Amino acid sequence: MIEKFFKEIKVDVDFYKKAAKHVIDWNAKARGGEQPEFDQAMFVSQIGFVREELKEYEEAAKANDHVELLDAAADVFVVSSYLVYMFFGEEATLKFLENQVGTVFTETIYTDFDNMEATFTDPVQMAVLSAGIMNLARDTLVRSVYADKKIMKEVLDSNDSKYPTKKQLLAVWNTSDIDLAISQECAAIEERNANRPEGAYTGVHATYNEKQKVYVFFDDKGKIMKPSTFVKPDIAKIIAKK
């Protein structure tokens, strides 16, 4: 057994465990405070979200855009930690994050992910890869020259702003009619995203979380939308203080 040979890179394990737990609870919040039974379509959708964020990272790497690299790495942590939870449950997800810091994302991580997935013949392979991707996302943030925990918190706080209260929606649309406000918000979300290169969002609708008194907007594929209350993470401000 090798001992006292490798230099340890410090990571706040508890912080990243709490971040993953935040993601798990955040997704439950979108579904009335309960975790659903995961079906095949949900796994396909969540894997798609991971792929989308890995693509953002690869594009940022080509441009050496540090803001977008950090944003994408944090987003990959968010979507992959939930995918790991879907495969393994909460206890195992948090246990994976006890691993020491390893390597970082390659500059072609999106291409690498696609190539690897094309060889898979068993769902277990994607499950294991998802755990690796989650840790790579964490380690990419930790090994950057920037304040990794501030960046992660900024992204988590930004995600929380996707869940408006009734009061916030009424204020945005200057009305006392919540049904009208919801209708206008759904239309606005579709309009804002009509020209996305990846394709427009369709079938946008809202659900109400009775327990936590917030609204959540989804498209017809189950992706959580960014309503008018969404606050984009200001990563540029954080790295400017480096």
Model-based region annotation:
Residues 1-242:
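Flexible "arm" and connector segments at domain edges
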